[in-house]
Amino acid sequence: MKQLKRKRKSNFSVQETQTLLKEITKRKEVIFSKQLNTTINVMKRMAWEEIAQCVNAVGEGEQRTGTEVKRRYLDWRALMKRKRMKANMKLVGSGFPLPTSDLDDSLTEDIDEKIAFRNDANFEWQNVADFRDAGGSLTEVKVEEEERDPQSPEFEIEEEEEMLSSVIPDSRRENELPDFPHIDEFFTLNSTPSRPTYDEPHLLMNIEKQKLELEKRRLDIEAERLQVEKERLQIEKERLRHLDLEHERLQLEKERLQIEREKWRLQLVSTEKPALENELGQGEKSMLQPQDIEAEKLKLERERLQLEKDRLQFLKFESEKLQIEKERLQVEKERLRIQKEGHLP
């Protein structure tokens, strides 16, 4: 059995915690790197060891290791989350008009919040009591004298994955950069109060309402435009119907004039051949005249049928045109109905 020696170390002082956070700020690109490979892990271990050396350089009497400063940082982060949640609960308990959904969102954001730091190098650490509270969470460190080397790569990678799993930025929120956290509850950096964010959901709701109102107005304008288009098509339909009637009237007039012209032609032919009729016998005259009249009648009937055929063809073409316009209007009406159903709240 290997013996475990327990050595009680003193808590981190305010100066050590201040130095710890400053050094993490300088190396946040390495510590909070999204990549997880051997090279990055080695760089992270080196960064934590450098931070431990800077903390030890403060001269408080304790020699901190990279693992200890990592644990100290995680304790500090956990304390910040607890204070944030307590502050939110106090707001609700005091009757502050914070909706339940806003409280849940704020707590969720605090749980998933990535710890980062301000770029300001001049820190003013005023709330010393909070540092002492945070320091109390790290009261004892076990030093195991076993064959397994704490500085081995396997140990460091395992410890790093265990302790920094909630610190490394999540891929779901990779667009967020690890900037400085809101640590007003831990210590006071300035006396300017932060702007309350409880009205952000109401602001988003108002923006969505305005968007829906604008979309509704646009749909109303589109409906009016379709109504005007429908009326225009109706007027066009009436105009085409009048044109058809006019065309038919002109066609009938043309047929009447054609018949009149044939009538006058027959009369002219009958007056130009009196001598021929006198020379021919009475039998030939009676036989020739009915044949000519019958031929002219057949010719006129043939022309009339051709004109009627052309007129029916024209009417068929116009009917197909109106049917296409009717179908297009029906499709447009159906599209507008579907669009309204999709945008109404």
From Swiss-Prot:
Residues 139-175 are annotated as: Disordered. The keyword S-adenosyl-L-methionine does not apply. The modification Phosphoserine is found at residue 106. The modification Phosphothreonine is found at residue 188. Residues 202-344 form a coiled coil. It comes from the Eukaryota. Pfam families: Myb_DNA-bind_5 (PF13873). Residues 4-77 form the Myb-like domain. One of its GO terms (cellular component) is nucleus. Keywords: Coiled coil, Isopeptide bond, Phosphoprotein, Ubl conjugation. There is a cross-link at residues 9, 114, 142, 237, 254, 273 (Glycyl lysine isopeptide (Lys-Gly) (interchain with G-Cter in SUMO2)). PANTHER family: MYB/SANT-LIKE DNA-BINDING DOMAIN-CONTAINING PROTEIN 4 (PTHR21732), MYB_SANT-LIKE DNA-BINDING DOMAIN-CONTAINING PROTEIN 4 (PTHR21732:SF0). This is Myb/SANT-like DNA-binding domain-containing protein 4. It comes from Mus musculus (Mouse).
